[in-house]
Amino acid sequence: TLFHYSSIVYFVIYLLNADSIKKWQWIGVIFICYALAITGLYITPIIGYIGWEPVNSLFIHYYSDSIIEENVNIFNIVHLGQVFCALFMLFIVDKIKYVSPFLIVALKIFVIGLCIKTVFSDLPVVANRSSELFTSIEVFLIPTALYGFFKKQLLYVTINILYSLIFFTYSLITWF
């Protein structure tokens, strides 16, 4: 084949509107995804009904592996920190959207990544891979949003360094 099956998830990015954002709709999506995960209603069983054989075989493989593993912890400090940052940026998006023409679409991609991790938390391989694929945009998004909000270079650099140090320290602690 000419592409990997996982590249299909990139098609979602093509459908995003980069000019405007309905912030309450995106905030609602985050809360709905968490509500589904808390109640134990996952969309993972629905994927099994897709009639495309490569997707079904991958799904069966990942699902059989996930029975051995635990679910993804969507209440860890890293994920909740990302959700808090996304909600904060959604609340101030009208103030910061003029910093970069890519900020709105980057914020939407970031929220999609967070929601994928939350909704597929019962399938760790899919949740982590897909989430990391989309949430890697935070490298651009968070510094740009901080600069747009504070408009002071030293302050936003300091906050960005603290944010990075907190998550780096957390990843070191959980690594060992």
Where are these regions (language model features)?
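Membrane-interface alpha helices of multi-pass inner-membrane proteins
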Residues: 1-16, 118
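Alpha-helical transmembrane segments and their membrane-interface exit regions
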Residues: 3-5, 18, 54-58, 136-142
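Transmembrane alpha-helical segments
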Residues: 12-16, 86-89, 138-149
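Alpha-helical transmembrane segments and terminal signal-anchor/GPI-anchor hydrophobic tails
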Residues: 14, 18-130, 174
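Membrane-interface junctions at the ends of membrane-embedded or membrane-associated helices
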Residues: 20-23, 144-158
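Signature aromatic-anchored transmembrane alpha helix within multi-pass, membrane-resident enzymes
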Residues: 31-32, 151-171
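Residues within membrane-spanning alpha-helices of integral membrane proteins
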Residues: 107, 111-114, 138-141, 160-164
